[in-house]
């Protein structure tokens, strides 16, 4: 495969923490825990960029600002794990890689659509049957945290009700519906 060699064990020449599986087009990522012999398996991915993003999330969680990242300009958009447990780091890394893959697919699909839009407008028999690709908008628009945010909202106490005065109706007008029929 281009970009790897047998001499370096399948490691990617550009991305840290990424290597290619033997006899496969899949890329894997793992990271060693600081000051421990343990490794955290981050997953198997279809592209080296997805594996590199997963590595970045884990490196940032484990090493903080001292981490050497593959994509240092994307630090602000990377998800942070909920805790320092390997399972949470794996989940955050997988989420970031999936979001990167979905965003990449959306960009490729948009580019393909813009290139064919001129032809499609001229061809009246064109239909959208070639649009069979799936794009997970939840990952593209950072929606995995929506349920957690909604749950946090449920923990808030509701606003206090205002004191209801019997002389005023719900709209704040005196005398209920009498204001409709009071003419000077």
UniProtKB/Swiss-Prot annotation:
Gene Ontology MF terms in the entry: DNA binding; DNA-binding transcription factor activity
What protein is this chain from? Ethylene-responsive transcription factor ERF024
Q: Tell me the InterPro entries matching this sequence.
A: AP2/ERF_dom (IPR001471), AP2/ERF_dom_sf (IPR036955), DNA-bd_dom_sf (IPR016177), DRE1A-I (IPR045277)
Arranged from A to Z, the UniProt key words for this protein are:
Activator, DNA-binding, Ethylene signaling pathway, Nucleus, Transcription, Transcription regulation
Provide the residue span(s) of the region labelled Disordered. 1-21
Enumerate the subcellular locations listed in this protein's record, separating them with semicolons: Nucleus
**SMART domains registered for this protein in UniProt:** AP2
Q: Which organism is it from?
A: Arabidopsis thaliana
Q: Which family is this protein grouped under? A: Belongs to the AP2/ERF transcription factor family. ERF subfamily.
Looking at the UniProt record for this protein, which Gene Ontology cellular component terms does it annotate, in alphabetical order?
nucleus
Q: Which Pfam families match?
A: AP2
Q: Which residues bind DNA?
A: 14-72
Instruction: Describe its function.
Output: Probably acts as a transcriptional activator. Binds to the GCC-box pathogenesis-related promoter element. May be involved in the regulation of gene expression by stress factors and by components of stress signal transduction pathways.
Query: What GO terms describe the biological role, i.e. biological process, of this protein?
Result: defense response to fungus; ethylene-activated signaling pathway
Main location (coarse class)? nucleus
């Amino acid at each position: 495969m281009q970009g790897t060699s047998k001499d370096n064990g399948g490691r990617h020449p550009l991305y840290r923490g990424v290597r290619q599986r033997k006899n496969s087009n899949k890329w894997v990522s793992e990271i060693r825990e600081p000051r421990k012999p343990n490794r955290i398996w981050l997953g198997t991915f279809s592209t080296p960029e997805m594996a590199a993003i997963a590595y970045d999330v884990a490196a940032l969680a484990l090493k903080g600002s001292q981490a050497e990242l593959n994509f240092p300009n994307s630090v602000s958009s990377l998800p942070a794990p909920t805790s320092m447990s390997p399972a949470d780091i794996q989940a955050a890394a997988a989420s970031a890689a999936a979001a990167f893959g979905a965003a990449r697919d959306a960009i490729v699909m948009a580019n393909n659509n813009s290139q064919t839009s001129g032809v499609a407008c001229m061809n009246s028999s064109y239909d959208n049957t070639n649009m069979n690709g799936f794009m997970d908008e939840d990952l593209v628009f950072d929606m995995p945290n929506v349920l957690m945010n909604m749950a946090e909202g449920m923990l808030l106490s509701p606003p206090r009700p205002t004191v209801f005065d019997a002389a005023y109706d719900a709209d704040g007008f005196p005398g209920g519906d009498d204001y409709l029929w009071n003419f000077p």
